[in-house]
Amino acid sequence: MVALIDTNVILNYITDREDRFRDSSKVVMDLCSQGKVDGYIAFHSLSIIWYSLRIPDEGKRMWLKDICRLLTVAGASHDQVLEAIENVQFKDFEDCLQDECAKMVNADCLVTCNLKDFKMAKT
């Protein structure tokens, strides 16, 4: 199974933050590390994670390298980014980019803690 892992799942995993999806986020990441799920991370999630972590830069680099060893970075084409900009069905542009990245890697699913904002997702 190919899955694009949304930023919030990865942040739950890294920070162990109190969230109702905390345990599920860990399970998803464990499945990726065991090779049971072919996990991807959207290219722009890396900068969001960097910005969100409240730790020294050395720690941020360590976490990003670990995540990139665990998940493959997925991009989006120029045309897909333009399509995301024009897509008025998504309220959040970043979520639309997640969906475009999932489409780019032919993901079977997009794993997120934010189900309500992905009702219009193609994946």
Q: PLM features: residue spans?
A:
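Anionic, Ser/Thr-rich low-complexity intrinsically disordered regions
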Residues: 37, 41, 45, 62-65, ...
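Structured loop/turn residues at beta-strand edges in well-structured enzyme cores
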Residues: 5, 69, 105
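Short, well-structured N-terminal submotif of metal-dependent ribonuclease cores
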Residues: 1-39, 53-59
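Generic alpha-helical structural signal
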Residues: 23-26, 61, 65-68, 82
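Residue-level signal for well-ordered alpha-helical positions
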Residues: 16-17, 52, 87, 121
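A short, flexible beta-alpha/helix-coil linker loop
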Residues: 10-11, 46, 81
